[in-house]
Amino acid sequence: MRTLHTDTEREAAAALVQDRQRWLALRRLPVAAGADIPALFRDPRTQPAGLFEDGKLLACMIPKREPNPGWGKGPCLFLGSVHTLPDQPDDITRLITLWASDFAARLDLPLVRAEALVRHTLDAEPIAALLRRLTNMGWEIQGSGPGQEGDRVARLEITAERRSGLSTLIGCRVHEPHTATPKERGNT
């Protein structure tokens, strides 16, 4: 896992996001409507991060130190705009989960929070299957409501936990994320 520093890396992340959005749309699954997510990954000010294996980008996200994302209580590491390469196993999500929990603990943050787009109730398929997989990985569902980008989301959190030995499985070269500003959170 590393911060995406170069224009080439950020462009690869934007392309991954577009591929994932197309994949979701073809399956009639929810896609973020309110924001140009690929543009966020092209912007070096967002400090996006990517999960690589053998030089191949498997996932990307925008990690932020968040004092309060508008739901939940207290500070957290917020994983914004998480996208994985289409048609990949859940192992990628599991690695992101382990990394994020460990990274948050190393930043002295108590929690990791993330959001998953939803269209219907949380017990309706296909979101219910995704949420079951995430809860099996340790995530807790904190209800649903408007997300950081204004779309309806399932709100997720997991406790930060140092995971000794994780560095043999996944390396971390992610810069400490900045604190999200009210403008970045959509608050003015």
Walk through the language-model features, giving the residues of each.
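Active-site rim helix/loop that mediates acceptor-substrate recognition in acyltransferases
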Residues: 25-53
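Conserved acetyl-CoA binding element of GNAT-fold acetyltransferases
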Residues: 71-86, 115-116
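Conserved acetyl-CoA-binding loop-helix of GNAT-fold acetyltransferases
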Residues: 88-106
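Conserved GNAT acetyl-CoA-binding A-motif
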Residues: 104-124
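Conserved active-site alpha-helix within GNAT-family acetyltransferase domains
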Residues: 118-146
